[in-house]
Amino acid sequence: MIDINLLEKLNAPTAQQRLDNLKAILADIDFPPTVPQYINNHIHTTYSFSPYSPTAAVFAARMEGLCTAGIIDHDSISGAREFLQAADLIGIPATIGMECRVSMDGTRVAGRRTNNPDQVGVSYMTIQSVPHHNIEKLEEFFKPYRAARNERSKKMVANINALLPGVKLDFDRDVLPLSLYSEGGGLTERHIMYSLALKLTAQTGKGAAMVQRLEDMGLTLSEKQKAQMMDTQYPFYEYDLLAILKSAFVPRIYVDADEECPSLKDLVKLCKEVDACLCYAYLGDVGDSVTGDKKAQKFEDDYLDELFLCLEEEGVRAVTYMPTRNTPEQLTRLRSLCDAHNMFQISGEDINSPRQSFVIKAMENPLFANLIDATWKLIDHEREGKALPI
C-alpha cells in the first residue's frame, strides 16, 4: 500500500484532478527499478471496487516494481482512459480490459458450476487487450447490464435488512454513492458489503465492541480476523470487516444474476467486433485454499476436459489464470489442456483490497515465462494492432 497521503491525492474526486495531482507527485518521486517478471493484468479500480482510482492503481503498481500494469473492472471499462493517461505520465506500458459474468445456457456445460462461487450456469470471463478506439463501444454494450445488476443489488440490500433487523440500509443513500455508477462504473456485492461494514462501524464502533457484535450476529472469527477487528488504527478497517462480512453473508443474501449476464454467443460476437481477447477465467477446485481466503468448494476440475471442448466450440480462444491461487497439479493439467486446444494463456491476479501486493511472485518461476510474453502481446495488440495468437 502506498503512502496514505499520496493515495488521497491520487483518489481526488475527478479524473482530471487525479492526473494533475499525479503530475505534481512525479516531480518529487523516485520509483524503484522495474522487475521484468512483475506483470499484473487484473487490477481493479474504483470503477468497480478498489481502494485505488485508475491513477492511483498505476502509481501503486509502479511503486512495487511492476514493468506493466493492466486494468480490469466488473461490467465496466470506464476507467481505462484515465488508466492509460496515468500510465503514459508514469512511463509504464499498460493493457486494458474488463470482466463480466456470462450465461452458459445453450452450451454443453449449461447448468453446471464453473468458476462462480455464488451461482451455477454463469461463468466469469475477461475481455482483454481492447483496442483503445473501441473503449466506448464496449462501454455502451454493458450499460444496460449494469442497470440490471443494480436492480438485483436492491433485492440483496432488502435481504440484508430482513436478515439483520438492527441494520437499515438504503440502496440509493448508502450503497449507490460508494460506486462510480454515475460515471459508468460497476456496482458489485462488495459495495453492498462495504456499505454494511460502514453501517456496523457507525453503530458499534471498532475493537472489542465490533468483535462482540459480529459474534452476536452468529459469526465465528479466526484469531487473524479478531486481531484485525482489534486494530482500531488501521486506516482501512472497513475493508477488513468487508472481507469478514462477504464470506459470511453473501451466500445468505445472494440473488441469482440473470438479465445482467450476456449470453456466451453474444459476448463472443462482441469481442470479435471490437477485436478484443475473450478469456475464460480458470478458478479450479478449492481444497486447502492456497491463499487462505476461500472455503473448500468444487468448481470446474471434474469436467475440465469437457469445458475446454465447450470453449473451443463456442469460439473462446484464451484462458486466464492465477498461478498463485492453484496447486502445481492443477496448473500442470490446465496448461496441458491449453496447449492441446491451442488456447492463448494469459495471467493476472485480482487486486481489490489495500492489504494485497500488486506483485505476482509466481512469475519469478521460469515456468511462467509464457505469461510474461503474453502480456507484451496484449500491449502490442492494443498499441500497434498486432494480431493475437487466438
Residue spans for each PLM region:
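Extended substrate/RNA-proximal surfaces in nucleic-acid metabolism proteins
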Residues: 1-30, 88-301, 377
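A metal-dependent hydrolase metal-coordination microenvironment
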Residues: 33-187, 314, 320-379
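Amphipathic coiled-coil/heptad-repeat helices and related helical stalk/stem segments
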Residues: 53-54, 260-264, 303-304, 330-331
